């Protein structure tokens, strides 16, 4: 049984009045709250937003809450029509405004921590599905809400040892003997110039040691710590062995629910918090990591670096694929087995024909169908077992396959 994975119904943690802290983030009057929406948003929706804002500033909480629900329902339909890339950003702003108003209404007279947790979930939905509004106000609201929640309790059940000692799934349970394979070289804190000349420019993978092992996350992060900092936050979770499988899907749940369902208890399915910009959503976690100095060798600005979290149980798999940017993969918890193939070997890796999966191989790396994919057997590769504190440099377009050998948390930095 999963146990209590939600934030408990306890008295609020008092650090000043919650409503006072939230109200201080808002413009003084409704006239100062600029919406600035484009022509694609119907006039009737703009009018509804203006009316909801007026209701909020007039203190008519119940009516404002009702209006915000209408805004959210209508804009949700717009967000889920067609492909995500084609959704107009103004509709994402409308959704974010609806989330802001609803969260604020919920917090005007909170009764217990469950009410604040519900408001926090609304904020997270705005952060995940909406667009930035009013100087990233949803981030600020979420941060305040977290300070007014009581300490998070870990999900009930036996927390696995770290690294995870549960039996691995039968299909991918073996730890490969990388001594039999050509391994990725390891270097201890190479100079920027040496890294640039020997690895960045020629596009050669390398594992960097002594660069990240002093980061706070290496000592602080555990299941309990992650639950304490992020337990009540809503995140996207991939369900299924790998994203190329037909039964693969995505869902939204809190971090507590994810840990309880896919890590603490014996799961029927594989769950993976993968490729999520968790550190933008929860800046407190971002304080525990650093951007590697080697990223300064790129052409882009620091704010253009994409930082993703990869958190899941033993057995999670990222199929063989390539990315359009340079990648530093930092291992924080657990170990991962990784295979790397040069872009020059693309013809032997049989990429999918579809536009959506053109950067992903059809080959199951550790159980290949060599009758269907005969060239794969002769494709040379590098491999490694990446351990906590190590950083793997994956050059742009380099094919890579990743399998978690333990309960694992990785951080990737995509840069140009």
UniProtKB/Swiss-Prot annotation:
Cofactor(s) the record lists: Fe(2+)
Protein EC: 1.14.11.73, 3.4.-.-
Binding residue positions for a protein: 238, 275, 318
Matches recorded under SUPFAM superfamilies: Clavaminate synthase-like
Catalysed reactions, semicolon-separated: L-arginyl-[protein] + 2-oxoglutarate + O2 = (3R)-3-hydroxy-L-arginyl-[protein] + succinate + CO2
Residues annotated as binding 2-oxoglutarate: 272, 318, 321, 327, 336, 400, 414
Superkingdom of source: Eukaryota
Annotated residues for binding of Fe cation: 321, 323, 400
Effect in UniProt of substituting residue 275 to A: Loss of L-arginyl 3-hydroxylase activity toward RPS6. Loss of peptidase activity toward methylated histones
Any one GO CC term of the record: cytosol
Principal subcellular localization: nucleus
Consequence the record notes for mutating residue 238 to A: Loss of L-arginyl 3-hydroxylase activity toward RPS6
Tissue expression pattern: Weakly expressed in most cells. Highly expressed in breast cancer cells. Expressed in embryonic stem cells.
Cell compartments where the protein resides: Nucleus; Chromosome
Outcome following mutation: residue 414 to A: Reduces L-arginyl 3-hydroxylase activity toward RPS6
Co-factor note (free text): Binds 1 Fe(2+) ion per subunit.
PROSITE patterns: JMJC
Cross-referenced Gene3D superfamilies: Cupin
Gene Ontology MF annotations: aminopeptidase activity; chromatin binding; endopeptidase activity; histone H3K36 demethylase activity; metal ion binding; p53 binding; peptidyl-arginine 3-dioxygenase activity
Protein's recorded name: Bifunctional peptidase and arginyl-hydroxylase JMJD5
Gene: KDM8
């Amino acid at each position: 049984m999963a146990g209590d994975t939600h934030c408990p119904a306890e008295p609020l943690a008092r650090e000043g009045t919650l409503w006072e802290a939230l109200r201080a983030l808002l413009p003084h009057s409704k006239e100062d709250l600029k919406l600035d929406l484009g022509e694609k948003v119907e006039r009737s929706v703009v009018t509804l937003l203006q009316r909801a804002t007026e209701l909020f500033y007039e203190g008519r909480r119940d009516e404002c809450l009702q209006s915000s629900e209408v805004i959210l329902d209508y804009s949700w339909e717009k967000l889920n029509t067609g492909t995500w890339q084609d959704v107009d950003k103004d509709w994402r702003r409308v959704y974010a405004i609806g989330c802001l108003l609803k969260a604020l209404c919920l917090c005007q007279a909170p009764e217990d921590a469950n009410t604040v947790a519900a408001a926090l979930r609304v904020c997270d939905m705005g952060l995940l599905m909406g667009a930035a509004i009013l100087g990233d106000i949803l981030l600020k609201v979420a941060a305040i809400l977290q300070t007014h929640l009581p300490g998070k309790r870990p999900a009930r059940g036996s927390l696995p040892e770290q690294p995870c000692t549960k039996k691995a799934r039968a299909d991918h349970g073996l730890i490969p003997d990388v001594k039999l394979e050509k391994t990725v070289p390891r270097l201890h804190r190479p100079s920027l110039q040496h890294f640039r000349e020997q690895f960045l420019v020629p596009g050669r993978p390398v594992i960097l040691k002594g660069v990240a092992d002093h980061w706070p996350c290496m000592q602080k992060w555990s299941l309990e710590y992650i639950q304490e900092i992020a337990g009540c936050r809503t995140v996207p979770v991939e369900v299924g062995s790998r994203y190329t499988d037909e039964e693969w899907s995505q869902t939204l749940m809190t971090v507590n629910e994810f840990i309880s369902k896919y890590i603490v208890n014996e799961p029927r399915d594989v769950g993976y918090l993968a490729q999520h910009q968790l550190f933008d959503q929860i800046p407190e976690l971002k304080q525990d990591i650093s951007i590697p100095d080697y990223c300064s060798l790129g052409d882009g600005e620091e704010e253009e670096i994409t930082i993703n979290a990869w958190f899941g149980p033993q057995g999670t798999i990222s199929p063989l694929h390539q990315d359009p940017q340079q990648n530093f993969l930092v291992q924080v918890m657990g170990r991962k087995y990784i295979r790397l193939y040069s872009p020059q070997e693309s013809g032997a890796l049989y990429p999918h024909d579809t536009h959506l999966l053109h950067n992903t191989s059809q080959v199951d790396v550790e159980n290949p169908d060599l009758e269907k994919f005969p060239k794969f057997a002769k494709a040379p590769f590098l491999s490694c077992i990446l351990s906590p504190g190590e950083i793997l440099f994956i050059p742009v377009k380099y094919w890579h396959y990743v399998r978690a050998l333990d309960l694992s948390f990785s951080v990737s930095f995509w840069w140009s």
